[in-house]
Amino acid sequence: MKWSEISIHTTHEAVEAISNILHEAGAGGVVIEDPYDLVKERDDWYGEIVELNPDDYPEEGVIIKAYLPVNSFLGETVEQIKQAINNLWLYDIDLGKNKITLSEVNEEEWATAWKKHYHPVKVSEKFTIVPTWETYEPASRDELIIEMDPGMAFGTGTHPTTVMCLQALEKYVRPGDHVIDVGTGSGILSIAAAMLGAQSVRALDLDPVAVDSARLNVKLNKVQHIVTVSQNNLLDHIEEPADVIVANILAEIILRFTGDAYRLLKPGGRFITSGIIQAKKQDVKDGLLAAGFAIEEINVMEDWVAVVALKP
């Protein structure tokens, strides 16, 4: 089978939004080539060692590659992708160069591209993320393994916003907690909360592609008895109180439901947020304070920010 590789040269800020557009267009996988992966300290990744080829990475910005089946609808699909990406300007998302190119690859090249960019990554004291085809032996009995299907948007490691959310969940989720994951995407944060002992996790996403992917990954990690995945717009119509709410989405979207998050959290509960670029940090902080939260932590990794807010 022939595949067409669509390559988009963009910014860190636009990665998650463009990845979502590509999945909705039916991409058979997304690869993220981020030059930060070449220069970041290995200590940040708990000793993970991966051989990376500098020739695969841009000097600046990020390259997102996706694979589309070559068929009679390819031209129309590519035009729809371009239009959807251009529309991101309406949300004040910086697209950078926004250079889009196409090339053809065969089935074997497509499979090789995946394996080149997808490796086990230890992202916190407890969590290691492992692609489904790799055999990985835990270093200790306390290490928690999250298996992920390669159909998700993954780069050579894990996106900094996901890493910071995982680290915050590890710190704040307690056995018996009730957790809500807003904009669950692949479901990775919901899976982590379940593995940390949460009694129940509600994984919410408006995108039906994300809902299907999250359900597959939840089942793959055998936590479907704890995690319920459903299609939902943010926290609309959600009434069950929570001990922890986590949201790894754009700052503008976080600000739309800070009031709902405050309403649903129990006293002493925490709202863990990321997907925030440095330029939007103060906006998110101000919005959380206005909703009644106290700011407990602000963490930074590369150009990204995570905020942990406490409901007094």
UniProtKB/Swiss-Prot annotation:
Pfam families membership: PrmA
Keywords, sorted A to Z: Cytoplasm, Methyltransferase, S-adenosyl-L-methionine, Transferase
Keyword Acetylation (UniProt): no
Catalyzed reactions: L-lysyl-[protein] + 3 S-adenosyl-L-methionine = N(6),N(6),N(6)-trimethyl-L-lysyl-[protein] + 3 S-adenosyl-L-homocysteine + 3 H(+)
GO BP of this protein: methylation
Keyword GTP-binding: no
Enzyme Commission number(s) of this protein: 2.1.1.-
Binding site for S-adenosyl-L-methionine: 162, 183, 205, 248
Alphabetized InterPro entries for the sequence: Ribosomal_L11_MeTrfase_PrmA (IPR050078), Ribosomal_PrmA_MeTrfase (IPR004498), SAM-dependent_MTases_sf (IPR029063)
A GO CC annotation given for this chain: cytoplasm
Domain of life: Bacteria
Gene3D superfamilies documented for this protein: Vaccinia Virus protein VP39
Compartments where located: Cytoplasm
MF terms (GO), sorted A to Z: protein-lysine N-methyltransferase activity
Protein function: Methylates ribosomal protein L11.
NCBIfam families named in the record: prmA
Family to which the UniProt record says this protein belongs: Belongs to the methyltransferase superfamily. PrmA family.
Protein name per the record: Ribosomal protein L11 methyltransferase
Annotated organism of origin: Geobacillus kaustophilus (strain HTA426)
Underlying gene: prmA
